[in-house]
Structures are given as C-alpha cells and as structure tokens.
Amino acid sequence: MKLFFSLALFVVAADQFSKYVALRFLRDANQSISIIPNFFSFTYAENRGIAFGLEPAPPALLLLFTMMISAAVLWYVLRSNNRRLIFLLPFSLILGGGVGNMIDRMVRGYVVDFIYFNLYNGYVGNIYLSLWPIFNIADSAITIGGTMLLLFHRTLFPDDPIA
C-alpha cells in the first residue's frame, strides 16, 4: 500500500508543481510557449469543465463528482486484497490525477490546463475543428490509469465474466 499512496502523492505533487509553473510563467505574460512549432506548446487555459473542455454541470457539482470518484477508488483499493503492482498502479494514477484536479477546483474554481498538442486546427466542410484539447499532468495520469485498466482487464479481474 505504500507504493499505492506514494505514487498517488507523486502524481498530485508533480501536477500541482507543474500548474504552479504554468500559472507563474504562462498566465499573465505569455499565454503560450511553443516547444515544437505548430505541434507542441505550453498554452495556459482555465478549464471550468471536465475532460475535453466539456461543461456538463456547475463547478460545485463537478467538485462533488470528483470527490466521489476519488473516494470510490480509494475505498475499492483498500477493500481489495490484491497488492500486485499491475493492480495498484492504474488506481494510484487515477486517484492522484483526481486529487490533483480536485485541489484546483477547490482552490481556484477551475482546473489549470497547459499541455497542448496541435494535431489539427482547421475546417472540415463548414465546421471548424480543433482536434486536441489542452490538458495537464492530472488528466494524463487519469487517462493512463484508465487505459491500463482496459488493457490489463483480464489480468486484473480474472474472475470477471466480461474479461
């Protein structure tokens, strides 16, 4: 369990530190710093919604939802007897990412996003399309953890008939 909590704490710390740097160097001076021209940049954004910029509910409800998901992940891991790394790793990434974004919602009322891959910006017919959202380390951890759960479902949950 030390590994589970250590990794979750590391994700929270890395996420919060990176957001501090984004707030300090991107918010007021330059909204964007190009790393690889026309492909990768650090671009400051305030996300009041959830993944991919969706705003399905008021901020207080999103905060409550984040708290409930984080509590459910923690409860599930503590209740389980499985202590293998392949089991703990995805859940620690999801918990750490959830807590990192939850801190932002509690302190600022929005989540700081700053990582941007410019995969495609342009028109498809008459519709303008921006193919990739701006995200942060917490979002990355949640996505990686969720992907691991999907990829290793049979290994993680061998008794599940869906596996």
Curated annotation (Swiss-Prot):
GO biological process, one term: proteolysis
Alphabetized UniProt keyword annotations: Aspartyl protease, Cell inner membrane, Cell membrane, Hydrolase, Membrane, Protease, Transmembrane, Transmembrane helix
Catalysed reactions, semicolon-separated: Release of signal peptides from bacterial membrane prolipoproteins. Hydrolyzes -Xaa-Yaa-Zaa-|-(S,diacylglyceryl)Cys-, in which Xaa is hydrophobic (preferably Leu), and Yaa (Ala or Ser) and Zaa (Gly or Ala) have small, neutral side chains
Family indicated by similarity: Belongs to the peptidase A8 family.
Role played: This protein specifically catalyzes the removal of signal peptides from prolipoproteins.
Gene Ontology terms, MF aspect: aspartic-type endopeptidase activity
Pfam families: Peptidase_A8
Predominant cellular place of this UniProt entry's protein: membrane
Membrane-topology descriptor: Multi-pass membrane protein
Signal sequence range: none
Root EC class: hydrolase
Superkingdom of origin organism: Bacteria
Localization annotation: Cell inner membrane
A cellular-component GO term for this protein: plasma membrane
Record bears the keyword Transmembrane: yes
TM regions (residue ranges): 58-78, 84-104, 111-131, 132-152
Name of this protein: Lipoprotein signal peptidase
Pathway named in the protein's UniProt entry: Protein modification; lipoprotein biosynthesis (signal peptide cleavage)
Active-site residues from the entry: D113, D139
Organism: Chlorobium chlorochromatii (strain CaD3)
EC numbers on record: 3.4.23.36
